Amino acid sequence: MARKTPLERYRNIGISAHIDAGKTTTTERILFYTGVNHKIGEVHDGAATMDWMEQEQERGITITSAATTCFWKGMDMSFPEHRINIIDTPGHVDFTIEVERSMRVLDGACMVYCAVGGVQPQSETVWRQANKYRVPRLAFVNKMDRTGANFFKVVDQMKLRLKANPVPIVIPIGAEEHFTGVVDLRKMKAIIWDEASQGMKFRFEDIPAALQASAKEWREKMVEAAAEASEELMNKYLEEGDLSEDEITSGLRARTVAGEIQPMMCGTAFKNKGVQRMLDAVIELLPSPLDVPPVPGFDEDDKAVTRRADDGEKFSALAFKLMTDPFVGQLTFVRVYSGVLAKGDTVYNPVRGKKERIGRIVQMHANERQEVDEIRAGDIAACVGLKDVTTGETLCDPTAIVTLERMVFPEPVIRQAVEPKSKADQEKMGIALSRLAAEDPSFRVSTDEESGQTIIGGMGELHLEIIVDRMRREFGVEANVGKPQVAYRETIRKTVQEAEGKFVRQSGGKGQYGHVVLKIEPNEAGKGIEFIDAIKGGVVPREYIPAVEKGVNEAVTQGVLAGYPVVDVKVTLHFGSYHDVDSNELAFKMAAIFGFKEGCKRASPVILEPMMAVEVETPEDYAGNVMGDLSSRRGMVQGMDDMVGGGKAIKAEVPLSEMFGYSTTLRSMSQGRATYTMEFKHYSEAPRNVSEAIVAARAK
């Protein structure tokens, strides 16, 4: 079966934004204009097509990135038909992992900003992730019809807060209730959308007299940005003082794909203005799978290889999302990087060393699905019936094995005990939690060895609330949830040259004998546990060294101060002894555990606590109280910015343990007018009095 849409006409894009910037409404309008859905689903009444999980419809926030396919021929039908695969990403900080996952498989992104709120905290997080995966992007300033809307202020904020290089390619005509359309700076014409047709029709007009000088000035900046794409364009621009429309487009495209500039547009998705122009820009300025570098990976021998976006290459794809569907079971969303995958094919998962047979392949339109017989390079689709694949794993042709780079997922910073309400819930809860953990790698499930309780861990209070909510809705599990617990860590501050561990049991017959001497030293922050074998002369036989490493890895799960996991320690095995008859792996493992614990006690152990980057947006009247309150929570206030629509944005770093219940305090302090976001920043040493309290609480 031949490819319906040539690969150069594919666009795999993400739509990313802060909560309430109007991202879901923007996606809805895209689906409407591309003719996929004929009734515009409004977020306000919980009917948006992309927000397909029940809680999202209630909370009005987007939680899981749904993947949708649509087609576009241009606002004035001037392009050949292009295929746009859209990944809708969440804007709430607790779901940052979803954004990270979708960034990994995108070729381009469209950042949606609110014309009133401007660049908000989550916008910065998403921007950093897009930088990490080198995703070319456009910016769309939404909600131009709202009171306080200011397009040019958002342009300045992007430069200041994101260190971006925004290049407006349209400017607004009017603002707030007088926003009527945009000036297209390439055509130097005003675009006015027809409200009766919900923006499906539009007309070109002359630029209003009051805007002509401003349009000329912004056009010059845009042409200059385009000219910098190549020497040829620059020379023409210097000689003639201008470029043709096609030259501007090709220059802007080259620089956008290279990540040097971010073309900017504006509109109001809710009032059906501007989204159509943004779709044109997606096609004109964002890359196709052929424009981005081949995806890197490793073959069986761990040699670096790449896979090109080409149907003729061997098949390779990355599983970037798992979802449980009530009707078809497990859906595994994949991005195909090379080759073709047909129903019934067998693929290989190099991470697990297993083969899997592909049952059905479906392409999603939000949560409506269409079955397809095959998918090709550049496609995004969901496979049904894969048993043993988790997020971030590679699927490839069994004859050409490749592991595409793995995604790295953060450790949870907050934990809660969860107990089923009845015996019947007990069995269902295990199944529910393991399914949810497979879908979401930033959510972890473990058992507390002392109390036997089930512990769930995640990236924030809202994250865990939604998990418990999903257990109830999707799996019918009623559960009681304990108080949130902070995920503390332990580490050391001093080096201990000789930490000796001995495990000897000799009382007639075959005994046990293991003896190790370890050097224990602090490691760089974030480096984790490093084990180095420095044994010379066989004083500890080769076959027992893995057992020593295993012992160290077991010992680090419980620190010596309060039993929290130990991080960032370098352990060197440099001496020891053995017994010809009595030595075995168990004895050396135990010796390593004893040696490590003994060494840690002498290495100035400390407790680390998670520090959160907190940003509070508040009316100016309450700024002083907010800062005082953050300081009383052991917070370090790092700065205060003016917000686009008035008010202050206060940035601070605060220990997570001090932030429980903060939303209630903030609400009462500001009469419900302040909001905040919080995300994990790093671990930091807890002050002595806090440390002592933590140790005392654990000892009870």
From Swiss-Prot:
SMART domains in the record: EFG_C (SM00838), EFG_IV (SM00889)
Cited NCBIfam families: EF-G, PRK12740.1-5, small_GTP
Source organism of this protein record: Verminephrobacter eiseniae (strain EF01-2)
Name this polypeptide is given: Elongation factor G
Family annotation (PROSITE patterns): G_TR_1, G_TR_2
Compartment(s): Cytoplasm
UniProt entry tagged with the keyword Nucleotide-binding: yes
Summary of the function given for this chain in its UniProt record: Catalyzes the GTP-dependent ribosomal translocation step during translation elongation. During this step, the ribosome changes from the pre-translocational (PRE) to the post-translocational (POST) state as the newly formed A-site-bound peptidyl-tRNA and P-site-bound deacylated tRNA move to the P and E sites, respectively. Catalyzes the coordinated movement of the two tRNA molecules, the mRNA and conformational changes in the ribosome.
Organismal lineage: Bacteria, Pseudomonadati, Pseudomonadota, Betaproteobacteria, Burkholderiales
InterPro entries tied to this protein: EFG_II (IPR041095), EFG_III (IPR009022), EFG_III/V (IPR035647), EFG_IV (IPR047872), EFG_V (IPR035649), EFG_V-like (IPR000640), EFTu-like_2 (IPR004161), G_TR_CS (IPR031157)
Domain (tr-type G): residue spans on this chain: 8-290
GO cellular component: cytoplasm
